[in-house]
Amino acid sequence: MIRTYFGLEQDPFHPSNVELLPSQDEILSTLRVHCQQGGLCVLVGEPGTGKSVIKQALKDLDPKMLLTPTVNRTLHTYHSVLRILCEAFNIEPDGLAHKCESALIAQADKINKQGKMLAPIIDDAHLMEVDALRRLRLVFEDFPKNHNLVLIAQPELLSKLSLAVNDDLRSRVTYSVLLQKLAPDDAIQFILRQLDKVALGHNTFTDDALSLIARSSEGALRKVRNLALAAMLEAVRDRTKTIDLKQVNRVLMQPHWRRERDLGD
């Protein structure tokens, strides 16, 4: 609907078309460097701070030379995670854990001989049992040094790793980063960059609308995107091609945008 109304060739704010902010691009570059030396990287942030954006950028970075098998379903036993990894590596999973481990290591060696790098991604790693993470780390210890195990999680993972009992895991982390919430100016720049991507003028959103979106999103990149898209839908309903306070405020009146104390009034 938005694409047709605004005469666009591609959808605005689409995840596959997001341009990284400078801070995100720096993180992506660092992750790639660690793929060349056998890394264990931890990417942590509150929901909506851009973890998924960086994950997708890593997956899209160089699909031919940098393979990124991904585990998104982390509420599993260690053996279940092994099976998911085998599927991601295009390996027929065997029933026994040690056979799955051996198959994964053999496949990693094969990929290394092809001159390719590996960046296995464990998403929502804070939901995994620490013992499962520990056993996974031991498996990747036997991988050739062409890999980087990337753990993407909420901040509670850092709390787990800070415990003395988990020092064996923490001491092997080669890079960690805590994603910060966006400053208002960064949120506005994100919107303007996305408009550039789809060849829409910066005046599509008025300055007041941009400022309100930046404040209301509370620094969460996902909220910036969702609020901007919803405001564009309201503009379609109003048959206007300029998003102003009227459209943004109408979105903010929806229950899921209002705080509990507001809903009780």
Protein language model features and the residues they cover:
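Walker A/P-loop nucleotide-binding motif
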Residues: Q36-A57
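A short hydrophobic beta-strand->loop->alpha-helix junction that borders the nucleotide-binding pocket
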Residues: E46-P47, T68-T77, Q154-P155
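Conserved P-loop NTPase "ATPase switch" module shared by AAA+ and STAND
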Residues: A108-A132
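Pre-Walker A adenine-sensing motif
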Residues: S23-H34
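Sensor-1/coupling segment of RecA-like P-loop NTPase cores
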Residues: L40-P47, K99-S102, M128-E129, D142-D167, ...
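Conserved AAA+ ATPase "SRH/arginine-finger" region at the nucleotide-binding site
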Residues: V71-T74, L161-L163, T174-A187
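C-terminal alpha-helical "lid" subdomain
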Residues: I2-G7, N17, S29, I54-Q56, ...
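Conserved NTP-binding/hydrolysis module of P-loop NTPases
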Residues: L8-S16, L66-T68, H76-G95
